[in-house]
Amino acid sequence: MDISSIVQTIAVYAIPLIFAITIHETAHGYVAKLCGDQTAYMLGRLTLNPIKHIDPVGTILVPGALLIGSALSGMSGIVFGWAKPVPINFRNLRNPKTDMIWVAAAGPGANLIQAILWTIALKILISMGIYEDFFIKMCVAGVSCNIVLMALNLIPIPPLDGGRIVTGLLPPGMAWQNLYPTLTAAAGEIRSVKSASPTV
């Protein structure tokens, strides 16, 4: 596959992916603000300006590598990424346990809405007889990026959105049992990395 095809593939996915992760994070912060936490608002993160949300690895390197790999192989693969998490202080929420559910669900909910809007855009293009390859592929990319991002974030493992939703739904004791194994595993990984690191 030539360079022009790789560039076209990146161009097709760039806008949908940037919208997907930017609106996902902004939705978290906006709902948190509605529920009483002003942290994201005070730090200027309630904006659709993607520069405020870009994570060098999650927004650029990982999606870029996936897109280039997909283009070189000639096969369509899953493309996903992530942005810098919007800072949220759950203690500031008016009803932390219940509001945490709404704040967590806002991100995947925003992705679902975007997937629907990209689907509508695709249907409009087809109904108008517009079969321009670039725009059709962009709409399809918009649907796939948002569905993948929504599905990954709904996995019920903290600190993913699904984990926070489950934690908010469970009674306090069971919620801790849901969170504790993840924290223990993370601590174990950190200890492993430290023990494997050379002494300076």
Predicted segment positions?
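Hydrophobic transmembrane alpha-helices and their immediate loop junctions
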Residues: 1-200
